[in-house]
Amino acid sequence: VTNPHPYFAPGGNPDGTRGGGPEHAVPGDQDTARAPLAMAHRGFSLDGLENSMAAFRAAVDLGFRHLETDVHTTADGVLVLFHDKTLDRVTQERGRIADLPAATVARARIGGTEPIPLFEELIAAFPDVRLNIDVKDWNSVDALASAIERHALHDRVLVASFSDRRRRAVLRQLSRPAAGSAGTVSNAVFVLLGPVLPATLMGFVARRALQGVHALQVPVRYGAVTVVTPGFVRRAHRHGLQVHVWTVNKPAEMHRLLDLGVDGIVTDRADLLKTVLTERGTWA
């Protein structure tokens, strides 16, 4: 994909290359095979310790340089890394994070053992790692934007959300652009209208609906609809968009998607994705 945001620049992958295939090479990169982005979904833990420092460390120790994570904000404005809006599913505590002070959230233990990390902890622990951040609630919009500005993370983060409005609200507050991925509505526009609109009209629609978007992050299927098809990948690349697929945990499916030319894979099985990329010669 031509002229990607610095988030996708060399150095983000274990072998220092970027997403996409040779046919999508950036000028000056013709001599370098461009590796897909390998993204560890909530880190890597076979024991259910998702979004814990232990899980992030395990992924980084495997060689991952892109971590996917989620942010919520406590009642007193502290940005934490956690997927659910409540603590109930994976900790011994109960309640909505947005209603609880940081001191209460700090007592929670993921899987009974691991504390919920602060956003600040993750960026300090792994200063060279890039973060795919899913903004889970409106309370986190200002908190995340402030953290990106305070730590100059514009080139290290990709801001994602199922809500296009939340993503845009974060990006609007930044002094320079951070990478972004499409939300549910923008993805639906591209998936549903892409095959039926003439290319020129689709280009106009894409520019309007996908302003500030650098990647389409999608599941292989949504209900009965197959999202990731050869045509979908071609259309995305034609409009300068990367395709990242979540959450892919089977090696055969990883190979199939990589053969289609997707630019990134989000996985719970960082170990298996590393093996697949090693087999394909795109892991250092």
Where are these regions (language model features)?
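Phosphate-group recognition and catalysis centered on beta-loop-alpha active-site segments
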Residues: 1-284
